[in-house]
């Protein structure tokens, strides 16, 4: 029976697979993706993560984000988030 059903499908919810009630499966299935765990960076004593987000390169200036480069000079991204359709 394990080879008949795809991974994540409860056989009790769909006894005649592949003819299933999609609303019932969506209601009772867990579709939340697993969040991978990433260990936090180990900052040495005296170095604040807020002051140096790209440690150990604290002296280097972080490049501008992609959304900042797309706006022309004088247009702030927070003032007009859907540029060029500003109101």
Curated annotation (Swiss-Prot):
Query: In this UniProt entry, which cysteines form S-S bonds?
Result: 14-20, 52-58, 80-86
Q: Which GO terms describe its molecular function?
A: structural constituent of cuticle
| One Pfam family cited in the UniProt record for this chain | CPCFC
Q: Does the keyword field hold Ribosomal protein?
A: no
Task: Name the keywords, alphabetized.
Answer: Cuticle, Disulfide bond, Pyrrolidone carboxylic acid, Repeat
Q: Where are the sequence repeats?
A: 5-20, 43-58, 71-86
* Keyword Repeat listed: yes
Q: Tell me where in this chain the PTM Pyrrolidone carboxylic acid is found.
A: 1
Superkingdom of source:
Eukaryota
Q: What is this protein called?
A: Cuticle protein 1
